Amino acid sequence: MKKLFLTLVAGLCISTGLFANGDVRQDDKKQNYANSKFVWTQNYVVEGANAAMAPTTEEIVTTCLSKDGKPLRWVRKNDIYKYGKFTGTSTLETALYNMAVDEMINNYEKDGTLRTGLYWGGVWTRDVSYSSLLSLAYMCPDKVRNSLEVKIDRMGRIIQDTGTGGSWPCSSDRVVWALSAWNIYLATGDMEWLEKAYPIITKSLACDDMVVYNPQTGLYRGESSFIDWREQSYPTWAQPADIYLSECLGTNAAFYGVLKVTADMASVLGYKKEAKMYAQKAEALKQAINDKFWVEEDGYYASYWYGRQNMIRTQHSETLGESFCVLFGIADEERAAKVISSMHVGEFGPPIFSPQIVSQGNYHNNGVWPYVTSFWGKAAAQVENEKAVMHALACNVRTASLYATNYENYTFNTGNPYTTLMNSPNMLWGLSGFMGLYHRTFFGFEFSKEGLSLKPFVPSVLAGTRKLEAFPYRSMLLDITVSGSGNEIASCKVDGKDADAFIPADWTGKHTIEIVMKGEHKPSSINMVGYIAMPEAPVVQMNAGKLQWKPIANASKYEVLKDGKVVAETTSCEQQVAEDGEYLVRAVSAKGVHSFVSEPLRVYTDALVQQVNVDKWLDNQLGEQVKVKVAVPASGWYVVDWEYANGNGEVEQRNHCANRQLYIDGKNKETMVFPQRGLDAWNAYGWSSPVKVYLKKGTHQVALRYLEKNININIDLDKAHVKSLRITRLP
């Protein structure tokens, strides 16, 4: 079998000119990684009828063609060696690193910022921030800083990228800017930058505390970080206001990381009171994440909570959020190890989330994003899971080799980058993830304000000697050599003397670090489950006192939920209901895979619902904008929401989401959001985010006020039309 395989590779290489003489060199026979889809040996990657290899350390060739049928090849074109010279254990290993550095330089814009990808110009807050965390904060800190500075608005707040319903707060992950800002400081020690970044971060967090934070759950609202294509990850019925209400693992993990580094910033800057406050907030959020998202029977954190009046937890795992829970220390040691070994993985890598939504195209859904794979690989190294680290490295090597570039994404169950809805080569966070995973595993980079620690995690099959020469760190040039494999250091010499594998931040000049690994790894595993399909969500109607829906393919039963809790199971497609409440139905497959719940169906007698005509405009004038008197017939819990239109932009574009504070009898209750519902769609009325309040019997004043912290990302255009107020008494 091995002979046949090598003959096939040799034949492929002769036919495509990958080897000058058609000979498979001895080192190419060493197999690094193989599964049923692809093989990675020392100097080539083979998948089906395609192969790729590196003739030199400055060139990668492949039999794969571009999407339009043209040959693919990478050849170095930039001065990459001023960022250090990497020498791996094979020509391909070295060439792939060189390609990532080369593509990093390709993304340098004339204005000193970083381009997002070959096809996408401009700076995106989350793209540059996550790229910074992966490697760019120390590879090109000046470029990252310049990029962060263009994502500050004139009010001194972080700019949220374009997103659902008019950007912030439906999308709320802009705070990852702070993680990048802190990592620039760790890499450079630049106090001037820290002093500039800190007030921008704290002002943004203050707005989020009022508009995004939910004190009832202790979590932050807004769609999953970077997973911002609505129907790609949410049920199709979800309106922008529903997506704002969702509480997501990745976004909350990011907020935790931000609160933690903001406390660290405050401490460095001498703000002891603020440092304590942010540290306490971080600890409270950490507890809330563990309480609300952890699913013991699955061994990982759930992706998000969603709904309207009542919230439901999804069954999904979500790779970026899971990875952050490990990397940021949200998960304790036991949970962290369990997350990496339990979350869903496929042969081409970990999916963005799992299970998949059959009716949706490939992008976030049914997609692998190499930068997320890199975060997952780093998290795997942290918990010392050799199989996961090896799988992450192999999947990144496979795609970069076969397509001779660092793509943004590819299809989860085929590995094809050409079958996703949108993609770009030379992608900033793809290339930064590739470099970052090399740095974390082969050299063990860990930056702190005290200096650079080296804690390599080299898989056994990748044992060998690797060098990173003339690597710039602060006022130093470092020559680093790591030999062997394993997760523990056997010996370390710094400048020829036995020492800890640590370089103090205040050193200057040239230094040599030589590390030999012990060659040991503990047993590890991953959960290779492949493609799992969700059943479709039922579409439910109320008819003669019964909930009714059409049969769902592959459903073995249906669960009926009232006010967020399962109250019945049935194999039929109807359910009698006799009580007032909010009803939902979900399909469950024979393997226990849940669909999304159906759109929440309000079943209330007329006596429980009041609707008052308003016909008012929300505009840019700070202060009270709407005031309505309502008579409440009995004391109890009520849901307040507003019928509104916002035609300032498409659901998926622009930044005109309107946010206002709900005041009842002069007391600030909560933020209510009025997202965009379609460009010029001023007759497309829907409902704002709801607020649950306790009201006593009698007359109350219900008002909407526009406060400075409500101001949207656009600043200049912040309006909506309010048609009516609805108050629903909960039974």
Predicted feature residues:
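Extracytoplasmic
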Residues: 579-580, 598-731
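Pro/Thr/Ser/Gly-rich low-complexity, intrinsically disordered linker/stalk tracts
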Residues: 525-554, 592-606
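Extended glycan-interaction surfaces of carbohydrate-active proteins
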Residues: 43, 47, 82-121, 143-168, ...
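Non-catalytic C-terminal accessory modules of carbohydrate-active enzymes
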Residues: 24-25, 346, 382-543
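Beta-strand-rich modules
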Residues: 576-594
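Inter-helical turn/loop segments and adjacent helix faces that build the functional surface
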Residues: 184-196, 262-277
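Aromatic-rich carbohydrate-recognition surfaces in CAZymes
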Residues: 45-46, 122-128, 135-223, 248-256, ...
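Bacterial N-terminal signal peptides
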Residues: 7-16
